Regions:
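Bacterial N-terminal signal peptides
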Residues: 7-15
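Acidic Gly/Asp/Thr-rich repetitive segments characteristic of extracellular carbohydrate-active
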Residues: 26-64, 68-69
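Right-handed parallel beta-helix/beta-spiral solenoid domain characteristic of secreted/periplasmic
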Residues: 28, 61-74, 78-142, 188
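Right-handed parallel beta-helix
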Residues: 63, 86, 92-93, 110-121, ...
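Extracellular beta-strand/beta-solenoid scaffold signature
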Residues: 72-77, 100-104, 127-148, 163-172, ...
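Carbohydrate-binding surface patches
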Residues: 324-361
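C-terminal beta-strand-rich structural cap/linker in extracellular carbohydrate-active enzymes
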Residues: 385-407
């Protein structure tokens, strides 16, 4: 009987920790010496940097306003949660938190979930192309964005990242992250050689990097929506890339100079964006590429010893189109009132009827938002009738964020 007592005590302690998980508050004019309450908030740097009493299971709430620091615009994140008690970083309920700069996730961060923040750089781009290369001295603006250097089991959920020099960087020492539901647009700059900066630039070896349910578009030729790439000295292994919407400009690449393995690419929806799996490596091991839709672009799979291709739809710009329309409505596993929609409007009709597949009920209403203006006014509104919503579409393709109000 006595051998069971430590188990009971440990279980009780864990239950009490979950019960007493705390909400802490930060604001742009907070201070490290404050109490971390709504009335006496911390500053963002000390809270995210692990210099406060934040424990596994706690939540850091960012009070509404803009968080900005110059120089050193990236706020370090050094927080340690547990797999079953992550630390959450998010806006205070009902508020909008903006980071004019960015975040850098550093070791020993673990099991941190960063939700619903807007990350951007307010300084304008130069009015003419700057010097060639990836680090031009005459660019002269903060880098901004979200940069992952050393977290384990962290999640980056429903972030809006725009007008940075690079949207997301996710490097080899970031283990088992999930990038989910992020809207990434208008990042990068123009050099005299080409466009630079990508929606997501990433490398990986150990663990699996998951990139799912994101909407990505680039403003410049030379930038990539997904740039999972490295030289012969870098690693591009073990990716799960699913249910993303990429359009406009910005090729979708997974591959580099070193052989890759463990590449899985499922149900991505591209328009005006080509997909390339494999780059300059003399050989690659295994990839699984299924159920992707690529319109006005190509699918290239290069130098794989084992490549599974199944149920992909690839239509070049001059290829015959099907009749009618194809719509893809994606649920959001972290926010039931957020949906993403991609529409291939083959017939170029003014409106398209979209089947909701049970994601909406009769009487539910949605606001359709432009992904590049998700905090602005809706493009349109619609009400679900008979498991269907009718939406406006201009041209062959449209992408929307749907904000749902349940009946």
């Amino acid at each position: 009987m006595s051998s069971c007592k430590p188990v009971v005590v440990i279980t009780l302690l864990l239950s009490m920790q979950r019960l007493y998980a705390a909400d802490w508050y930060v604001s742009p004019d907070g201070a490290a010496t404050n109490a971390g309450t709504r009335q006496s908030p911390w500053d963002i740097g000390s809270a995210l940097g692990g210099r406060e009493e934040i424990k596994a299971g706690d939540t850091i709430c960012l009070l509404e306003r803009t968080y900005r620091r110059r120089p050193n615009e990236l706020f370090d994140v050094r927080l340690k949660g547990l797999a079953d008690q992550p630390i959450h970083v998010r806006p205070a309920p009902g508020q909008r938190a903006r980071i004019d700069g960015g975040l850098a996730v550093q070791s020993p961060s673990s099991h941190v979930w960063i939700h619903d923040l807007e990350i951007f750089v307010s300084e304008p781009l130069p009015d003419k192309p700057v010097s060639a290369g990836s680090s031009p001295a005459d660019l002269k603006r903060p880098w901004g964005g979200l940069h992952m250097h050393g977290g384990t089991g962290c999640k980056y959920i429903n972030l809006v990242i725009h007008n940075c020099n690079q949207g997301i960087s996710c490097w080899k020492d970031e283990i088992d992250p999930e990038v989910y539901g992020c809207i990434i647009y208008d990042n990068g700059w123009v050099g005299v050689d080409r466009g630079h900066g990508h929606c997501i630039y990433t490398q990986n070896d150990e663990g699996v990097k998951t990139i799912s349910n994101c909407i990505m578009t680039c403003p410049f030729d030379g930038s990539y929506t997904l740039h999972a790439y490295g030289s012969e000295r870098a690693y591009v292994n073990n990716y799960l890339v699913t249910d993303n919407i990429c359009y406009g400009k910005g090729p979708f690449l997974i591959g580099g100079g070193r052989p890759s393995h463990g590449i899985r690419v499922y149900r991505n929806y591209l328009h005006g964006v080509g997909m390339r799996i494999g780059y300059s490596a003399p050989y690659n091991e295994d990839c699984d590429v299924r159920e992707n839709v690529i319109v006005n672009g190509r699918l290239e799979i290069a130098n794989y010893r084992k490549a599974v291709q199944q149920d992909n739809v690839v239509l070049a710009g001059n290829a015959a189109r099907p009749m009618g329309a194809k719509s893809i409505l994606l649920p959001n596993k972290y926010d039931p009132n957020r949906l993403y929609l991609a529409v291939y409007n083959w017939g170029k009709a003014d409106t398209v009827d979209v089947k909701t597949g049970g994601l909406l009920r009769d009487g539910d209403t949605v606001e359709l938002l432009d992904p590049r203006n998700v905090f602005g006014d809706p493009v349109a509104r619609a009400t679900c009738r008979g498991d269907t919503i009718r939406i406006p579409v201009q041209g062959e393709f449209a992408a929307y964020v749907l904000r749902v109000s349940r009946k």
